[in-house]
């Protein structure tokens, strides 16, 4: 397992240094982008990728504990003024509101897994158990059409509207 995780490190480093090239600059955009990928991919690597991009957008590194505190809004304004960033090109300033990026990524990486059977491991397991008990379950796309789009997507849109649209 460790070998597989270690292969993502160069990609995470690249994202930190090239985050502005993605065109995702606001917490609301991170919410939808992270969520869209978390619907179909494992949420842990998706979370790490977007977290690295958010840190890189601010010129920070996920590996640095002081940078983590800065993004979580745990540093005083005086400490923020002395914060050393990785690069200076198109860097968004770190503010006491920068934690909204982490919040948007965290929330969407978790909740969007319910959009598909494969978005979260237990979803597929529950489907299989139900089918073994002779409970009729919708197909992959049937689930999305009957439940994800009409029920979950409006809820996620409301979450975005309330918490992330203004940023």
Regions inferred by a protein language model and the residue ranges of each:
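Transmembrane helical segments that form the transport core of multi-pass membrane transport proteins
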Residues: 1-61
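Juxtamembrane/interfacial segments around transmembrane helices
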Residues: 41-46, 51, 79-81, 152-165
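Re-entrant/interfacial helical elements at transmembrane boundaries that shape
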Residues: 13-14, 45-58, 65-70, 120-132
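Juxtamembrane and boundary regions of transmembrane helices in multi-pass small-molecule transporters
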Residues: 111-167
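Transmembrane helix-loop boundary segments of multi-pass membrane transporters
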Residues: 15-21, 109, 164-167
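Alpha-helical transmembrane segments of multi-pass membrane proteins
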Residues: 25-36, 62-112
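Transmembrane helix-bundle signature of multi-pass membrane transporters/permeases
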Residues: 32-40, 53, 106-113, 143-149
């Amino acid at each position: 397992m460790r070998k597989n995780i270690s292969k993502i490190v160069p990609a995470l480093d690249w994202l930190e240094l090239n985050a502005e090239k993605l065109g995702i600059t606001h917490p609301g955009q991170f919410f939808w982008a992270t969520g869209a990928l978390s619907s179909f991919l494992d949420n842990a690597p998706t979370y790490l990728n977007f977290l690295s991009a958010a840190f890189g957008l601010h010129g920070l590194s996920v590996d640095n504990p002081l940078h983590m505190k800065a993004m979580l809004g745990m540093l005083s304004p005086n400490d923020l003024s002395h914060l050393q960033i990785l690069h200076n090109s198109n860097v968004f300033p770190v503010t006491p509101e920068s934690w909204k990026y982490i919040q948007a990524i965290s929330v969407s990486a978790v909740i969007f897994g319910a959009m598909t059977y494969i978005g979260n491991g237990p979803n597929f397991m529950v489907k299989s158990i139900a089918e073994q008990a002779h409970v009729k379950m919708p197909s992959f796309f049937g689930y999305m059409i009957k439940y994800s789009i009409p029920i979950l997507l409006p809820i996620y849109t409301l979450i975005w509207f309330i918490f992330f649209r203004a940023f």
